[in-house]
Structure formats: C-alpha cells, structure tokens
C-alpha cells in the first residue's frame, strides 16, 4: 500500500503509475475534497496517522509549513505496519522529494538503524547542502540526491510549458491555476 502525503498534480501522477503496477493507493491532503481522490480510485484519509497505520510505502508531495514540519517523525514511522495486505513482510519505505524538514532526519536514521524503516530516499534535506559527515549518508539503506530530482529535460520542459500557459491565462484576463494567493485577487 502506497500512501501519498499531499494529493496535487504530481502525487496524482505517482498514483496512476503505482496503480498500473497493481498497488493500492491511499492519500492524505487536508485541503482537497475526498471526491478528488475517489475519482481516480485512491482512498483519501482524513487523518494522517491513519495513512501511516495503513501504508508500508510513503511518498511526500506537500509543502513545508508549521503543520508539516517533522510530520514524518518517530511516532508516525513506528505506526507503519511493515507487512502488505497479504501479511507478507515488505518493510517500510519513505520517499521525500517535496521539501526538506518534513522528515525528521534523526528519527528516520534511528528507524533505519532499528529496522523499523527499511529504506529512506531523500532528494531534499532539512539543512542544505547536507553535511557530508551526516551518518545518514553512510547508511546502506539510505538513498539520496542533492535536490536535483526535478533536473531532467522532461521536467524542465514541463515547467516551461506551465509558465507559458500561466502567462497566457493572465494576459487573457484569467487567473493562473498556480496562483497561491487566489483569495487576494478576487
């Protein structure tokens, strides 16, 4: 079971790929109505703790806010089941390509060391650049990239298209889909 924290465009794309591989997908996003997830066959949880209790794989797709700082901590990692719906041991896995600081790196390292967490993949760190002496970097079940997860030709092409579409929308008198202060403009 894959749990997605945040269920915007990127998370919805991840959900489609996971479903194509036969994964059961769950999500938590306090800002989206349940109908958004239901429409694409994803189970939306109203409580983030329930997501951790249900899923062995967590992928982060939310912004860093006061509420999401260290959202993934020792307490929540310990809630993860480590077994799939067929009661087969598959371990617990976390991926964060969203924002540094959402994962409590010390808690994640302790969970890796204890075996509660099977693998951790980070493209973002709480403090960047990450300290080269960090014990996290030496752990055999840690996979990291230096905040370059979106540095692909395809991703940069998509960003260019998104910007062009937003500019065109505004020039035609509309409000761009990516506007973060929509309320202030109305």
Describe the predicted segments one by one.
Residues 18:
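Aromatic pocket-lining residues of Rossmann-like dinucleotide-binding sites
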Residues 23-24:
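Residues at the starts of beta-strands that form the adenosine-phosphate
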Residues 78, 126-186:
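C-terminal helix-to-coil terminal segments
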Residues 32-135, 151:
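Rossmann-like adenosine-cofactor binding region
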Residues 1-13:
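Glycine-rich NAD(P)-binding loop of Rossmann-like domains
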């Amino acid at each position: 079971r894959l749990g997605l924290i945040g269920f915007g465009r990127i998370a919805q794309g991840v959900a489609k790929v996971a479903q194509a591989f036969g994964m059961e997908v769950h999500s938590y996003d306090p800002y989206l109505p349940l109908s958004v997830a239901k429409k694409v066959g994803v189970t939306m949880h109203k409580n983030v703790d329930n997501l951790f209790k249900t899923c062995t794989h967590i992928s982060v797709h939310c912004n860093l806010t006061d509420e999401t700082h260290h959202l993934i901590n020792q307490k929540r990692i310990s809630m993860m089941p480590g077994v799939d719906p067929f009661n087969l041991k598959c371990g617990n896995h976390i991926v964060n390509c969203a924002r540094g600081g959402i994962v409590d790196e010390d808690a994640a390292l302790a969970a890796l060391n204890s075996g509660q967490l099977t693998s951790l993949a980070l493209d973002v760190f709480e403090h960047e650049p990450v300290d080269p002496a960090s014990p996290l970097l030496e752990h055999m079940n840690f996979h990291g990239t230096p905040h370059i997860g979106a540095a692909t030709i395809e991703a940069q092409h998509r960003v260019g298209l998104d910007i062009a579409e937003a500019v065109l929308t505004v020039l035609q008198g509309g409000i761009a889909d990516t506007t973060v202060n929509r309320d202030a403009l109305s």
